[in-house]
Amino acid sequence: MDNRLSFDYLPGTDIYLYQRRDMFRMNTDTALLGHFMRVRENDTVLDIGCNNGALLLYASRYTKGRLIGVDIQKEACELAEKNL
């Protein structure tokens, strides 16, 4: 595994994700947003500035709809894709 990556879990879930040590990382704000988000069963979720895809992973617990992540950093998009 790339030594820039860590393998962490999303608090309050049994979901794990990769995070880069040199990029923005999931934090308490992410966990709170993920916990309190309201997503219906077939909703499409768009996360602008998705970074590692953590919020999309939280959303995946609620919807069978599309999960779309957008980020300006190519590396962030690649990491989100790996996590999803």
Annotate each PLM feature.
Residues 35-84:
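Conserved SAM/SAH cofactor-binding pocket of Class I
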